[in-house]
Swiss-Prot record:
MF terms (GO), sorted A to Z: rRNA binding; structural constituent of ribosome
InterPro entries, per database record: Ribosomal_uS11 (IPR001971), Ribosomal_uS11_CS (IPR018102), Ribosomal_uS11_sf (IPR036967)
A GO cellular component entry from the record: ribosome
Record localization: Plastid, Chloroplast
Protein name in UniProt: Small ribosomal subunit protein uS11c
Amino acid sequence: MAKAIPKIGSRKKVRIGLRRNARFSLRKSARRITKGVIHVQASFNNTIITVTDPQGRVVFWSSAGTCGFKSSRKASPYAGQRTAVDAIRTVGLQRAEVMVKGAGSGRDAALRAIAKSGVRLSCIRDVTPMPHNGCRPPKKRRL
């Protein structure tokens, strides 16, 4: 009897032995820079911190979700603080500007963590978009 020829595009899933949190091990190592810009985007559901070089190229980013927080805990101030510490420690910044956007609860905690981390801040700028009577806001929640 002839052997069956294996299909090239078989859909069989092969587990290679990656850990459950494979995202952390597959992430590229961040470039080390001394001067940069820290963008803090604090929404009501999450806090995202992006570190860029002075030209605006993204070097590293971190969010409360990638730091291990799930669901409503992503919106906590502690999650914002941990996210900021994670981003700064990985890149190794010495001097930075901070751009803050949004009104979430992780905003002030992230700013406090950046200030305590030892990074010299040249300026802190609030770049939250403010409408000049633009789109209609969502209706009030009734609980």
